[in-house]
Amino acid sequence: QALLPNMRQQNYGRIINIGSVHSVVASPFKSAYVAAKHGLLGFAKTLALETGDCDVTVNTLCPAYVKTPLVENQIAAQAIENGISEQEVIDKIMLAPMPKKAFIGIDELAATAAFLLSNDARNITAQALVIDGGWTAR
């Protein structure tokens, strides 16, 4: 919100939030995380409504699992907790709900963000762009 006055004055701005697939769906045992991600999406949609009178767009990228250090730690922790191998965590827990069975690449997120920053996306606002390998199709 600190940037909005400047964006309004210039009549231009692009805001991209990084949410999660959990911005649009829930999962058991993740209530605080899901609530935070839903809140981020609500904030983005509200901000998009508030900036609809100028060339400012507000969108949220909602990826499924991206292989980051945080996810690597989750894999190791879940392997110990469930008494299974890390590969089994990846195959049977993390990628199981995704028809594509692959982690989302940083390059995929960057390409989507680059498009949203372009003038070709000037009428795309208040959107949750879900990049989830088909997870939410179920």
Task: Give the label of every model feature segment.
Residues A36, A44:
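Active-site helix of classical SDR
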Residues Q1, K45:
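A short, exposed helix-loop element centered on a Lys and neighboring polar residues
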Residues I80-I106:
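Catalytic Tyr-x(3-8)-Lys segment
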Residues G52, T57, I124-A126:
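Short, small/polar-rich loop/turn modules that mediate ligand/substrate recognition or access, typified
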Residues L41, P63-N73, A77, E81:
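Short, flexible catalytic-loop segment of classical short-chain dehydrogenase/reductase
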Residues L4, Y12, K100-I131, T136:
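C-terminal substrate-recognition "lid" of short-chain dehydrogenase/reductases
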Residues S20:
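Residue(s) in the substrate-gating loop at a strand-loop-helix junction
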Residues V25-S31, D53-C54, K101, N119:
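Active-site loop immediately N-terminal to the catalytic Tyr-X3-Lys motif
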